[in-house]
């Protein structure tokens, strides 16, 4: 067993380097040692890589969608998590205190005394720990939250638990999509596709997906996953087309686009009176030019911000993965080892001409 393990560290915008760390050892703040099988890459990883999310917490080991095998675990942590050495688990992003009023009320995603995170910014005392998924091993705090997932599912499929959890939660829990709903999904990335899949699963009436001209393959997959119509926003007027297809507007609009502002304005126009808008695409803390809040009032719209995924979203996603009902392998387009992490991120960002990725995974064992 190696004494040193490798991890990819981000030191600044578009700056990554390989470093070696001591293999984690069980202790008061290390409840388990995880051998990382795979870690998904999403749009926020891209923005973090570019520097759009600021320098807070750097240097850090990115990777907030890790999946792996527990190699060592303390008795106390095993009892808390309900798992044992040899189990495969999906790891949640945040490490809550588990004792503040918010945690005790079930709102641990908004913990007042957060210990840190997996793959995001951490306090100084945790910055030298193997906390992110772009590593061969991870140091899991006893307060981390994990979800068991079957070992016989290919790792590159099982690791989709995060985007699938987001799609399920944002469409069904926040959006309230149900039998007969008309739904607009703006953004045909992995979370958009997951939202389409979830909406179709519960019997949505009409599902419309939007994307850019370069998203042709994603939009084709959106139709395979259940979208009735797709809109190329580079060539068509989203609002006009939605109104044409729905006789006035959709019940639910989901904006899952990173940084783009126009989808928010389109959602307000394209959603029917009394409908719901779910905003999940981060915009880099920028103001939205042209936003008219009177329209929200006059149309009696409900607007919800969708922050990450919670335990129910993860558990529903894992049930979906384990069911084998869906051709999830069609979403999984690329997998790379640690030496090629930057290439993987640039691919997902659309920065590599001729290459298009949907779900891209880092596989430290490759």
Annotate the PLM regions.
Residues 81-83, 177, 271:
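Short, well-ordered loop/turn sites that connect or cap secondary structure elements
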Residues 2-5, 179, 232, 243-251, ...:
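C-terminal capping/lid region of NAD(P)-dependent oxidoreductase domains
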Residues 86, 136, 150-236, 240:
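Mid-domain Rossmann-like dinucleotide-binding core that forms the NAD(H)/NADP(H) cofactor-binding site
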Residues 204, 217-223, 228, 260-323, ...:
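Glycine-rich phosphate-binding loop and adjacent beta-alpha segment
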Residues 97-186:
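NAD(P)H dinucleotide-binding glycine-rich loop of Rossmann-like/cofactor-binding domains
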Residues 254:
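N-terminal Rossmann-like NAD(P) cofactor-binding module of classical short-chain dehydrogenase/reductase
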Residues 22-39, 53-104, 150-152:
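Glycine-rich beta-strand-centered segment in the early N-terminal region that forms part
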Residues 11, 23-24, 57-63, 125-131, ...:
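Short Gly/Pro-enriched turn/cap motifs at secondary-structure boundaries
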């Amino acid at each position: 067993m190696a004494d040193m393990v490798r991890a990819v560290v981000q030191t600044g915008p578009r700056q990554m380097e390989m470093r070696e760390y001591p293999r984690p050892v069980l202790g008061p703040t290390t409840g388990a040692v995880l051998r990382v099988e795979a870690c998904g890459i999403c749009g926020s990883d891209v923005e973090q890589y570019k520097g759009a999310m600021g320098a807070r917490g750097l240097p850090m080991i990115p990777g907030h969608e890790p999946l792996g095998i527990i190699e060592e675990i303390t008795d106390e942590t095993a009892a808390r998590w309900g798992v044992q050495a040899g189990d495969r688990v999906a790891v949640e992003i945040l490490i809550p205190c588990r004792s503040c009023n918010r945690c005790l009320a079930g709102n641990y995603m908004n913990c007042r005394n957060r210990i840190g995170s997996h793959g995001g910014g951490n306090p100084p005392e945790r910055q030298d720990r193997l906390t992110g998924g772009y590593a061969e091993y991870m140091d899991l705090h006893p307060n981390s939250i994990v979800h068991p997932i079957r070992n016989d599912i290919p790792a590159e499929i099982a690791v989709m638990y995060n985007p699938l959890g987001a799609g399920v939660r944002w469409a069904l829990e926040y959006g309230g999509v149900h039998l007969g709903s008309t739904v607009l999904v703006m953004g045909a990335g992995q979370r958009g596709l997951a939202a389409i899949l979830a909406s179709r699963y519960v019997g949505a009436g009409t599902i419309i997906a939007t994307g850019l001209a370069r998203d042709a393959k994603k939009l084709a997959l959106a139709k395979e996953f259940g979208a009735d119509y797709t809109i190329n926003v580079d060539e068509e007027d989203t609002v006009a087309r939605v109104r044409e297809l729905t006789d006035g507007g959709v019940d639910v609009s989901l904006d899952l686009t990173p940084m783009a502002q126009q989808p928010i304005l389109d959602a307000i126009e394209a959603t029917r009176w009394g409908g719901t808008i779910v905003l999940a695409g981060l915009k880099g803390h920028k103001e939205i030019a042209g936003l008219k809040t009177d329209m929200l009032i006059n149309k009696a719209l409900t607007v919800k911000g969708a922050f990450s995924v919670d335990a129910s979203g993860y558990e529903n996603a894992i049930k979906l993965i384990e069911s084998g009902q869906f051709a999830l392998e069609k979403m999984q387009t690329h997998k790379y080892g640690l030496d090629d992490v930057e290439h993987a991120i640039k691919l997902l960002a659309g920065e590599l001409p001729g290459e298009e990725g949907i779900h891209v995974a880092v596989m430290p064992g490759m």
